[in-house]
A protein has these predicted regions:
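Extramembrane terminal tails and long inter-domain/linker segments of multi-pass membrane proteins
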Residues: 1-9, 141-155
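Membrane-water interface at the C-terminal end of transmembrane alpha helices
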Residues: 128-148
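Hydrophobic alpha-helical transmembrane segments of polytopic
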Residues: 20-24, 67-71, 93-101, 122-125
């Protein structure tokens, strides 16, 4: 009969979530690199578009760029947070950030200006992985025998 240490199961779940966030980040990165490298519109027109302050109908402001940076940073932070947060905070952080990232990814597909087949492919992989992260965190149950103190349950 196989016995499993509850602490090991918890650490394995944390490690898997962290690894999934790394996978998502690599997909984000390479989708953007390939878009910048292979998209003719970006190669020829990006500077003019950004200088005008608009890309398509989107007004590029410091606030817009900051929002993009925050979205990227939340994914980067989840690599670390998935490893160090306690059960309850970890579970909810993965669910909330995963859902936010799914919405952002779906939104990125609505603008036709820079879409390429490879971008759609990467985004589909990202969304599938993010859906798995949300499901994996959602189905994560408190380890049996673990009793949360009031201080732990608030974290």
């Amino acid at each position: 009969m196989k016995t499993t240490n509850k602490t090991t199961v918890m650490k394995d779940r944390k490690a898997m979530l962290s690894l999934l966030w790394i996978f998502v980040m690599f997909n984000f990165t390479y989708a953007d690199i390939l878009t910048l490298y292979f998209n003719n519109v970006l190669q020829k027109e990006a500077w003019k578009l950004f200088q005008s302050g608009y890309v398509g109908s989107v007004h590029i402001t410091q606030g817009f760029v900051l929002l993009g940076a925050i979205l990227l940073e939340t994914s980067i932070a989840m690599v670390l947070l998935s490893r160090i947060l306690k059960y309850r905070a970890n579970r909810w952080a993965n669910i909330i950030v995963g859902v936010i990232q799914i919405v952002a990814n779906v939104q990125s597909l609505t603008g036709p200006l820079f879409l390429n087949l490879f971008y759609v492919f990467f985004t589909a992989i990202e969304i599938a992985c993010l859906l798995f992260i949300v499901w994996y965190a959602w189905t994560w149950r408190q380890p049996e025998g673990a009793v949360l103190t009031s201080a732990q349950s608030s974290s």
